[in-house]
């Protein structure tokens, strides 16, 4: 029962992180460059969406480590090379996803500061890079979720 709860919490946290990043990317693409809506999105909503993604990433890390500890105890440290390879890929993806997300969050903070100083073009200049970072997180997260289904079966 514990292992199932950990696994589902892990999967839901991953889905929330990917979903939050997908929402950010969709909103970023839908809003007109330099529009008041885009500035308002960056100034008021983007950090909240990113905070949700970051909390989900923290839960993902915690449940991943807990799940690995449980599985390790059950298998006595005896994992196949394929399992270890897939696990290493998932860990690598997580690290790169976290780097992309935190970079975008730093850019967002700088843009919010620029908007507060009445620099109206800041959001339009930064949004394409922020959207690309979130799309990258979505793509890598989708791969990680697919790899996770493989790990469940092994």
Q: Model-flagged regions — what are they?
A:
Residues 1-154:
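Polytopic transmembrane helical bundles with strong interfacial aromatic enrichment
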């Amino acid at each position: 029962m514990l292992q199932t709860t950990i696994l589902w919490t892990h999967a839901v946290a991953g889905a929330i992180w990917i979903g939050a990043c997908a929402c950010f990317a969709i909103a970023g693409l839908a809003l007109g460059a330099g529009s008041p809506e885009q500035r308002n999105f960056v100034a008021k909503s983007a950090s909240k969406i990113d905070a949700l993604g970051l909390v989900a990433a923290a839960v993902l890390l915690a449940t991943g480590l807990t799940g690995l500890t449980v599985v390790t105890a059950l298998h006595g440290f005896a994992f196949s090379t394929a399992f270890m390879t897939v696990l290493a890929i998932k860990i690598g993806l997580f690290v790169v996803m976290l780097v992309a997300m935190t970079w975008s969050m730093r850019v967002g903070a700088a843009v919010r500061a620029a908007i507060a100083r009445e620099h109206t073009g800041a959001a339009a200049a930064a949004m394409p890079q922020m959207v690309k970072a979130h799309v990258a997180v979505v793509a890598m997260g989708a791969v990680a979720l697919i790899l996770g289904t493989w790990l469940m079966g092994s």
